[in-house]
């Protein structure tokens, strides 16, 4: 018989996830259907989103060459029935205070940095790059981990060295870029470009750098259709950027620079976001989302 969620001590709430203690060495990592944008948790939820994030992470944890925090399968008997398919039992780690971002293309905050300084996170780039320009080699562009409601801030590699030391910083950069390349190559073979992605790493009890949190999900990555990619324009995306674009477009009536929270998403945007997340999972993994555990009976 599976435990109830109430049997576990609740430790923390994030923008999307809930964290519970299983025992002295393990945590329950639960992905909800919440969606955040521009550091706000939106009033609207995206049905099945937490299951997609979990399914995608499990797929990529198995694909890439890095130790990870998983401590059991998706149907681990320690996972309560009520969160089956959207929860994982993971090892407790000493998390690094750095968001490990890898970028293969110029977009988002990287584009803003480049337009202001000609660099991204202190890395000088050639002149003449535009929205969606592909880099010659992927970049490691770290950021600070912000508290809930605060903005992550891009930092330089030297800042990372100050935070975690030179040896660990070099290991983090090499691992981030290697994992990104593996995932991006796999996605591209299935017609999807991973423009950029964000990883989190921790240190396990043996001192090993360990991949944690979520991996290559539509929340943590920018996914573009490879068949209609074109430099110099906003791309057709499978990820949370679709929601961001609606919020900053004319239909939402929301001023990003004001002090009001974003409005709820209309039903058609909710449905389209759900469809994009599921399509990303199915195209990249080659699996049917309907076969993932925890769905309606």
From Swiss-Prot:
Pathway: Purine metabolism; IMP biosynthesis via de novo pathway; 5-amino-1-(5-phospho-D-ribosyl)imidazole-4-carboxamide from 5-amino-1-(5-phospho-D-ribosyl)imidazole-4-carboxylate: step 1/2. The keyword Cell membrane does not apply. Keywords: ATP-binding, Ligase, Nucleotide-binding, Purine biosynthesis. One of its GO terms (cellular component) is cytoplasm. Its EC number is 6.3.2.6. It catalyses: 5-amino-1-(5-phospho-D-ribosyl)imidazole-4-carboxylate + L-aspartate + ATP = (2S)-2-[5-amino-1-(5-phospho-beta-D-ribosyl)imidazole-4-carboxamido]succinate + ADP + phosphate + 2 H(+). CDD domains: SAICAR_synt_Sc (cd01414). The keyword Ligase applies. It is an enzyme of class 6 (ligase). GO terms for biological process: 'de novo' IMP biosynthetic process. Gene3D superfamilies: ATP-grasp fold, B domain (3.30.470.20), Phosphorylase Kinase, domain 1 (3.30.200.20). GO terms for molecular function: ATP binding; phosphoribosylaminoimidazolesuccinocarboxamide synthase activity. Belongs to the SAICAR synthetase family. This is Phosphoribosylaminoimidazole-succinocarboxamide synthase. It comes from Mycolicibacterium gilvum (strain PYR-GCK).
């Amino acid at each position: 018989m599976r435990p109830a969620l109430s049997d576990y001590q609740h430790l923390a709430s994030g923008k999307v996830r809930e964290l519970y203690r299983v025992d002295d060495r393990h945590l329950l990592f639960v992905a909800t259907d919440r969606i955040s944008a521009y550091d706000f948790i939106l009033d609207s939820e995206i049905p099945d989103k937490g299951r997609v994030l979990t399914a995608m992470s499990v797929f990529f944890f198995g694909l890439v060459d890095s130790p990870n925090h998983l401590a059991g399968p998706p149907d681990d008997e320690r996972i309560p029935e009520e969160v089956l398919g959207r929860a994982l039992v993971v090892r407790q780690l000493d998390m690094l205070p750095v968001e490990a971002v890898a970028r293969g293309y110029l977009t988002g905050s990287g584009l803003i940095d480049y337009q202001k300084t000609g660099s991204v996170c202190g890395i000088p780039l050639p002149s003449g790059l535009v929205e969606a320009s592909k880099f010659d080699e992927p970049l490691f562009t770290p950021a600070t981990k912000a508290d809930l409601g605060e903005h992550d801030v891009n930092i330089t590699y030297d800042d990372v060295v100050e935070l975690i030391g030179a040896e660990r910083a070099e290991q983090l950069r090499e691992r981030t870029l290697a994992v990104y390349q593996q995932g991006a190559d796999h996605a591209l073979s299935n017609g999807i470009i991973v423009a950029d992605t964000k990883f989190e790493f921790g240190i396990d009890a043996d001192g090993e750098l360990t991949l944690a949190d979520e991996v290559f999900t539509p929340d943590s990555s920018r996914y573009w259709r490879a068949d209609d990619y074109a430099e110099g324009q906003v791309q057709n995306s499978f990820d949370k950027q679709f929601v961001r674009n609606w919020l900053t477009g004319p239909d939402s009536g929301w001023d990003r620079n004001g002090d009001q929270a974003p409005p709820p998403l209309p039903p058609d945007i909710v449905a389209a976001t759900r469809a994009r997340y599921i399509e990303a999972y199915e195209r990249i993994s080659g699996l049917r989302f309907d076969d993932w555990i925890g769905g309606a009976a």
